[in-house]
């Protein structure tokens, strides 16, 4: 199949690749006046050399006479048209063209029609798609926005790319595709690749069918468009601005919406109670409970149990003080105002003397400064008043209305009067404190007998 293109003057049809060459050669050969014999060889050589340099090599029979002088002259011949139209043939074509030139010199008139026939035969080997593409590219009025690349019906790489990208859109987003006729060809439109109005979105992807369908149910041509990552982000921003849901969730919620991550997330998450009991600092206080809650936290109960075990292992005299510490911890949990001024206490243990342990156990900041000083001064001067003071202190506790979960024995309450604040000056002696503790514990008679 040969594709022709008419000239501007519509005189003679010419070939696309040899349009200018054929016009020049035909005019020179058929309109040339008769010349002398000496100039015939030079003129025919110049014309045939220009003609045959743009044509594929033509085989010549072996019976032809080949002389080295003619081959040498034909290589050195130059025509004025060589400066007008540049040739892109290699140097090897000059040798083959010289062989055809010798055949043309032997019979210039008879071989003219044979050259046309051979050129048409060679022209049939050119692909029609390449021929049409060259005609479109050479046209000055061609607009690239109106050019479509039409592929064959066989499975090509473009179809595989279309299946990989899943960029098949519905005609609802492409109003121009409704007017196009239905064809199975795959088209790549350059005009709509950069426009945001006809850009395909992820909501309109057809994952199953190879061809898209219009609103009327008719199959439409498959369209493959360039859809970059920037276009996807822009579509997501537009969807978020318009409050329209997208098929792909955002990056933050995608990690939580995946079922694989949801299956592994519970072992990695820790509850607040297990975290506080396992990795908590024992010297930092936890959040205070309300006044009506008698709950004791596990940290405080563990600390109280360890303090009681240490005190009871040292001497049996510290049992009352350990019970007082439990009572004070419960009262401190109930009264949040007193805990605001309370600092964390550290117990220093030593085996040299037992007096330091007793003084550390006597500290109680929950009582006022004046009442503790008054009670300590009265007990230091008159040890006999130790049995009378529990009445007033117990009445003061009942007036406040605080719960007493341990016991209502006056001996425990009376021993608490001997405790002083952290910020006051100690005026009592160790012997007096021991005498008071023993008398309150029921061993007053034995202690007095030992003194006498």
UniProtKB/Swiss-Prot annotation:
Record's compositionally biased regions (Polar residues): 64-81, 171-182, 384-398
Gene Ontology CC entries for this record: cytoplasm; cytosol
Modified residues (Phosphothreonine): 121, 169, 173
Transmembrane segments: none
Compartments where located: Cytoplasm
Region of interest called Disordered, as start-end residue ranges on this chain: 61-94, 171-220, 290-321, 348-402
Family recorded in the similarity comment: To yeast VHS2.
UniProt KW keywords: Cytoplasm, Phosphoprotein
Phosphoprotein keyword on record: yes
Record flagged with keyword Cytoplasm: yes
Modified residue annotations for Phosphotyrosine: 227, 295
Protein name as annotated: Protein MLF3
Chain positions with Phosphoserine modification: 8, 11, 14, 56, 74, 79, 145, 156, 160, 171, 183, 189, 228, 257, 265, 297, 320, 353, 439
Other notes: Disruption of the MLF3 gene causes increased sensitivity to the immunosuppressant leflunomide.
Low complexity biased stretches: 201-216, 299-321, 365-383
Lineage top rank: taxon: Eukaryota
GO process terms (BP): establishment or maintenance of actin cytoskeleton polarity
